[in-house]
């Protein structure tokens, strides 16, 4: 009988940003919360590193939930952002200041291994006070059901655990979302393939070569023919004493072009544009690869089933539209809203309302509007056939020369910095 199993008011599966946010918000409301993390140490299973935004419009930011986050867990504040469109040996650089600072309170570069480990420490202290805590090295493999109703989770290492609320923050390969029938994105065009290298560089060298202050950093994005016709692009983020350099491509485009992500990343690392910063040599500290969902197609409008609420990559909440790449902040918002929905359902006297309230809050707070812009449906066919890349390449090689670059380049820069237009032309 399931009555014999250990019970917690809330079980959070996954200790990344979304799970940590949910656990912190639950603990603040004195909800007995147990966090189960698959990695032997939080962050050890996560290979990503990127930018985390604090959006002015968001009801939750990671620094709100975790005081001291920016001082202890992030790398550099990213104050400058550019995109470089490359055609052969020519390039055109566009300043992304407008879109980077749009709705932005702050933006920091982070390394997930460091960040997740710090978050787990904070979450353990918070949840321990509620009678819960964080258990690492536990793989959750599915949902516990009783008479067809979801009542808890099952694991490889422990007996099943019952809960009134289950937050699935277990990533893009979520066992819980699949078991509940919520993960329905199976086609290659619904995924991005990301690869990343972390390159060693002393902090003073970063500041000199990128012309940034000691408390500042930069983001550089790359698109063009160095990626051999594969839809997607590259990125470079300045960390405290390293660089995160990587590429993100549509999985179906990689397959169609029979391209290897590692080779395309090498094309970027060897390009003369990067040599101005790497100066002929670099030491890779880490190499990693990851699949991420394309929210424009798969962000689940109803990411819940019974007692299960899913957040972050498990719910397809990864926003990639042109130069906008946001995932961690949406996971944090979703985690906070999931906890808020549960607390509100408790107050109403019916915990089963949590999923419905969570879905409602995602819409009311504008999260779904960002993840699945309606305008994208109008232009999907155009944007997924390389038209935008072709326009940018034509601009760079324009027979009008410098005058053409100034005129058409200015229009392109304005488009890159327009949230409205990026909702229609998301893929560069």
Regions found by a protein language model. Name each.
Residues 35-39, 313:
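Conserved acidic E/D residue at the C-terminus of a beta-strand in Rossmann-like folds
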Residues 5-35:
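N-terminal Rossmann-like FAD-binding beta1-loop-alpha1 element of flavoenzymes
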Residues 122-274:
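Predominantly flavin-linked oxidoreductase catalytic cores and closely associated redox partners
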Residues 343-428:
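C-terminal helical "tail/cap" subdomain of flavin- and related membrane-associated enzymes
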Residues 18, 41, 173:
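Conserved Rossmann-like nucleotide-cofactor binding loop
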Residues 39-88:
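N-terminal FAD cofactor-binding segment of flavoenzymes
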Residues 100-121, 254-260:
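Short beta-strand to alpha-helix junction loop
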Residues 227-230, 240, 253-336, 350-352:
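FAD/FMN-dependent oxidoreductases across multiple families
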């Amino acid at each position: 009988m399931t009555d014999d199993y250990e019970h917690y008011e809330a079980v959070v599966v996954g200790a990344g940003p979304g799970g940590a946010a949910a656990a912190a918000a639950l603990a603040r409301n004195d909800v007995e919360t147990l966090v189960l993390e698959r990695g032997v140490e939080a962050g050890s299973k996560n290979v990503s590193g990127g930018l985390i935004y604090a959006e002015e419009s968001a009801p939750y930011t990671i620094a709100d939930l975790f005081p001291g986050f920016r001082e202890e867990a992030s790398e550099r504040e990213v104050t400058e952002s550019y995109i470089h469109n490359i055609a052969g040996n020519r390039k055109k650089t566009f300043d992304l200041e407008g879109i980077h600072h749009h709705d932005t309170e702050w933006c920091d570069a982070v390394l997930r291994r460091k960040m997740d480990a710090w978050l787990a420490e904070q979450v353990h202290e918070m949840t321990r006070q509620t009678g819960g805590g964080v258990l690492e090295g536990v793989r959750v493999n599915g949902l516990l059901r009783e008479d067809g109703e979801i009542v808890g989770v099952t694991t490889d290492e422990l007996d099943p655990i019952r809960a009134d609320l289950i937050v699935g923050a277990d990533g893009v390969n979520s066992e819980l979302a699949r078991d509940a029938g919520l993960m329905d994105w199976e086609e290659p065009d619904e995924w991005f393939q990301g690869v990343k290298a972390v390159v060693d560089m002393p902090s003073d060298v970063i500041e000199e070569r990128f012309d940034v202050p000691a408390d500042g950093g930069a983001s550089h994005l790359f698109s063009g023919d160095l990626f051999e016709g594969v839809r997607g692009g590259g990125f470079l983020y300045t960390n405290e004493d390293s660089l995160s350099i990587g590429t993100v491509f549509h999985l179906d485009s990689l397959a169609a072009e029979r391209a290897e992500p590692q080779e395309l990343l090498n094309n970027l690392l060897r390009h003369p544009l990067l040599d101005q910063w790497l100066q002929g040599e670099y030491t890779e500290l880490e190499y990693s690869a990851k699949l991420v969902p394309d929210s424009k197609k798969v962000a689940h409008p109803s990411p819940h089933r019974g007692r299960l609420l899913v957040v972050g990559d498990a719910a397809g909440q990864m926003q990639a539209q042109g130069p906008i790449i946001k995932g961690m902040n949406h996971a944090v918002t979703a985690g906070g809203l999931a906890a808020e929905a549960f607390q509100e359902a408790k107050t109403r006297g019916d915990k089963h309302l949590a999923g419905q309230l969570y879905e409602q809050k995602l819409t009311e707070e504008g999260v779904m509007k960002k993840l699945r812009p309606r305008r994208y449906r109008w232009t999907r066919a155009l944007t997924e056939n390389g038209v935008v890349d072709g326009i940018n390449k034509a601009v760079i090689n324009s027979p009008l020369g410098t005058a053409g670059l100034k005129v058409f380049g200015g229009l392109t820069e304005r488009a890159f910095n327009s949230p409205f237009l990026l909702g229609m032309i998301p893929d560069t």
